[in-house]
Structure formats: structure tokens, C-alpha cells
């Protein structure tokens, strides 16, 4: 009997389009290797699809928020379905750039200087602070987005 793989792709992150493409490519390769494959979105029907399809494993093709941050992993672990990707804690730590940075520094892994902007400074104060503390160019990146979403080099 063929092993059944459910691919979860799409989602609501800013990386939705690339996630859908990832899902299609993974499905193509798995089918070539004789797996029974189904693709679904992580929506209100996900648990029903899992219950009806009864996959041996779930391939997590989600990118960004809800796919790489431990959220979908928590759901899958709670219902006891094996899945691809790092576990809940590893995913959450890796997706949060502040937590990742602290882990790197604690383990003496060199990283560029950084600070977390929490919107308490005015734009003028922020620019003044950055000019004093950093050499240009600087990289501005959201704390919890994936890939290069909303990354700016200034």
C-alpha cells in the first residue's frame, strides 16, 4: 500500500505564493516516488482533511508565519501526526530574530550588532540613535518574518 503524504501549503503569510509553489513541486516529486499525495491549505477544514485522508506524514510546505514559527507544529504534535520541519520550540526560536540573536551570542557565534526597535522613539530619535551606534548601510528586518519579506537596506 502506498504511503500517504499530506502537503500543507499556502497559508496567510506574506510568503503564501511561494508556499503554494513549494507544495506543488513537493507533490510532483513525491508522486514520482510512488507516494499517494494530497495538498491542502491550513484552514478550517484541515483537521477534517487529516481525519479523512489519514496521512502517514504531513509535509509542511508553509513559509513564514504559522508555518515556520511553531504554530502548525503545535497543532500537528497535539493530534499526533508525524511531520517534516523542526519541532515546536526550535521553530519558534529560529523564527524570532531576537531570541535567535541571544542564542547565537550566548554560544559565542559572531553576529552583526543589532537592536530591537519597539516604536518608543520618534523617527528623529531613531535616526539619531542609529547614526551614533551603527555604520551604514544598516539592515532593517521584522523580528518574525521569513525570507526577505520587508527587509530594507539603508
What is each stretch, according to the model?
Residues 53, 109, 134:
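Structured loop/turn residues at beta-strand edges in well-structured enzyme cores
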Residues 127-140:
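Acidic/histidine-enriched active-site and ligand-binding environments that engage anionic O-linkages
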Residues 1-89, 93-95, 99, 106, ...:
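ATP-binding N-terminal substructure of ATP-dependent carboxylate-amine bond-forming enzymes
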Residues 103-111:
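Basic phosphate/pyrophosphate-binding loop/patch that engages nucleotide-derived ligands
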Residues 1, 33, 110, 136, ...:
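Residue-level signal for beta-strand positions within conserved beta-sheet cores that form or flank
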Residues 19, 112-116, 137-154:
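Glycine-rich phosphate-binding loop of ATP-grasp-fold ATP-dependent ligases
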Amino acid at each position: 500500500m502506498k504511503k500517504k503524504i499530506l502537503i500543507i501549503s499556502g497559508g496567510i503569510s506574506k510568503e503564501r505564493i511561494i508556499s503554494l509553489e513549494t507544495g506543488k513541486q513537493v507533490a510532483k516529486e513525491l508522486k514520482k516516488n510512488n507516494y499517494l499525495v494530497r495538498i491542502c491549505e491550513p484552514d478550517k477544514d484541515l483537521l477534517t482533511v487529516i481525519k479523512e485522508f489519514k496521512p502517514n506524514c504531513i509535509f509542511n510546505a508553509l513559509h513564514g508565519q504559522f508555518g515556520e514559527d511553531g504554530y502548525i507544529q503545535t497543532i500537528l504534535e497535539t493530534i499526533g501526526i508525524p511531520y517534516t520541519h523542526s519541532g515546536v520550540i526550535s521553530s519558534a526560536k529560529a523564527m524570532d530574530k531576537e531570541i535567535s540573536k541571544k542564542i547565537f551570542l550566548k554560544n559565542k557565534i559572531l553576529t552583526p550588532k543589532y537592536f530591537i526597535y519597539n516604536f518608543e522613539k520618534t523617527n528623529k530619535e531613531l535616526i539619531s540613535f542609529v547614526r551614533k551606534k551603527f555604520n551604514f548601510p544598516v539592515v532593517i528586518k521584522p523580528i518574525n518574518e521569513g525570507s526577505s519579506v520587508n527587509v530594507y537596506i539603508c
